[in-house]
UniProtKB/Swiss-Prot annotation:
Keywords: Membrane, Phosphoprotein, Repeat, Transmembrane, Transmembrane helix
Protein source organism: Pongo abelii (Sumatran orangutan)
UniProt region (Disordered), positions on chain: 1-25
Family, per entry: Belongs to the MAL family.
Chain's gene name: MYADM
Phylogenetic lineage: Eukaryota, Metazoa, Chordata, Craniata, Vertebrata
Annotated membrane topology: Multi-pass membrane protein
Domain of life: Eukaryota
Listed name of the protein: Myeloid-associated differentiation marker
Amino acid sequence: MPVTVTRTTITTTTTSSSGQGSPTIVGSPRALTQPLGLLRLLQLVSTCVAFSLVASVGAWTGPMGNWSMFTWCFCFSVTLIILIVELCGLQARFPLSWRNFPITFACYAALFCLSASIIYPTTYVQFLSHGRSRDHAIAATFFSCIACVAYATEVAWTRARPGEITGYMATVPGLLKVLETFVACIIFAFISDTYLYQHQPALEWCVAVYAICFILAAIAILLNLGECTNVLPIPFPSFLSGLALLSVLLYATALVLWPLYQFDEKYGGQPRRSRDVSCSRSHAYYVCGWDRRLAVAILTAINLLAYVADLVHSAHLVFVKV
């Protein structure tokens, strides 16, 4: 039967009585000499160099520096685990679905490193005085960019192609789930100060929208990583379609309400950045209130587009049990 190039087949696992639902995957030390293995070695080295440069001079004070250091250390650690698993052929014993885990992590790592490559130089490095610490911080940013490109390349290499039988997380909707949850986490970071939304019920609704959609998308990811999609009381494809549709509707309301109540004077908003006293001067390691409001508005629009794309692409998936 010819392959239908407009559709991608997704494998889902039906857990047997013995608890073994996924096929055995055998690794080989030779995997490290293959293009993907060499790419992961580049990821390992670049993240290691990034956090080593920063740690050697202590250039990671404050929340932005801490975030960047966490990003590089986390990506290095998980990449090392993936390489060890493949080197020792332990994929079958790995607690999560090996069909879904590596590409899920690669997508998250690309986004993490991208955020660190932007946040670290703009909110931390520019405030460092010229000298050894600044030079190390700039070099760390460079290696962070290399890591970002390396992880993004892995995603491009291993994502599902039309007509291919693969895990859900390798498909466009699966990768969009990663983007949706990551963007939601960034939104939560920007609204960590409750004064940004507690004065208006409409803004509190927006925060509830971000939380609800994040939880549902995270559940979808965890169900795939744990290969337990069959525990849902409804078919998994129906759950995904309902999740995408609900998220589109909820985010549409947030996209209207958040800018309206944050930037329109009629609803108590601040239309001009100059009126926000916290933005009157530059602060190291700090993003002022008006900039946070604007960032959340932009991220809300990005996530709405992601959910719309998720809804559209989900219609082109075919699920089969293995």
